[in-house]
């Protein structure tokens, strides 16, 4: 399913809040994909939601 992940791209949760849509089986996997893509810690993940398009 398509999942929307909102995240802060810089250390200490700074910078503009960003949003990306990824294809994953669950919310945890979607957050992990974004953390790996942008090399950010879990605390930088702001929200994970179902993408409603």
Model-derived features: positions:
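Short aromatic-glycine-(Arg/Gly/Cys) micro-motifs in beta-strand/loop hairpins
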Residues: 1-17
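A structural detector for beta-sheet-dominated domains
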Residues: 6, 23-25, 51
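Short linear/disordered segments characteristic of secreted peptide precursors
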Residues: 10, 27-29, 52
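A short, exposed loop/beta-hairpin motif centered on an aromatic-Gly-Thr core
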Residues: 15-25
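Short amphipathic, charge-patterned alpha-helical segments
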Residues: 30-34
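Short, mixed-charge low-complexity intrinsically disordered segments
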Residues: 36-53
